[in-house]
Amino acid sequence: MTAEDASVPGDDRRDQMLRAAAEIIAERGFSETRIADVARRAGASPALVIYYFGTKDHLLTEALRFSEQSFYAAADQMLSGLANVRGRLEGLVRLTCMPQQTDEIPGSWGLWFDLWSQAFRHPAVARDRVELDQRWRNMITRVVDDAVAAAEIDKIDSTEFAVTFAALLDGLSIQVSLQDPVVDADRAYRIAMRFASQALGFAWAPTRRRRAAKAGGPA
């Protein structure tokens, strides 16, 4: 450990390394990221990065967890301020499909691409992938269960809905992240909300405000 390594509290130093790893993996991809690159950007030694994370695979999963913190913090705050299922699901879809809705790492969807690729071949990464995906499904399930309890919607298999809706949002978000010329953020938003409203039985239609904003009118 260098003198510079020792000058920063452990938790802060770990966060610095995770942010550096998340940024570099998002920029270059997992295969092109080296421990030395992460150490250099974080102002740490490669030995310290290895001390904290052991392997590059583990660094990837921890970097993704770090980048997801801002997403879930924003989601929890958003959900607490909305009173109905339609507004809550609209908020979750915007956080998922609209670019940079939170203070997340730029290009953070690239971390998920690399995680999925590594999970296909590495059991330890696969286990982490299951945990991360389940956290997302659990949030959707909670939104639906709360709506059922409040008599906003009829009783439904919330777990089944969450699995389907999460998979739909994953697919749409991939297209948006890849800048697909057919599936942009607005279309992804409309598709997701149309599905949710039909599956859960609440009224929904794109607002005039959104159409005006897309056409270049006032927001």
Role assignments for model-derived ranges:
Residues M1-D12, R19, W204-A219:
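N-terminal intrinsically disordered/low-complexity leader segments
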Residues I105-F113, P123-A149, R190-R194:
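Amphipathic alpha-helical packing segments from all-alpha helical-bundle domains
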Residues Q16, A20-H58, E62:
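Helix-turn-helix
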Residues A126-V130, V148-K214, A219:
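Hydrophobic/aromatic-rich alpha-helical bundle segments in the mid-to-C-terminal region
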Residues E62, D76-W109, F161-F165, R211-A212:
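Hydrophobic alpha-helical connector segments
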Residues R65-S70:
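Short, basic, alpha-helical segments at the C-terminal edge of helix-turn-helix-like DNA-binding modules
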Residues T55, R121-P123:
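Short loop-to-helix capping motifs
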Residues E27-S31, G81-L82, A150:
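Short coil/turn segments at alpha/beta junctions that flank glycine-rich nucleotide-binding fingerprints
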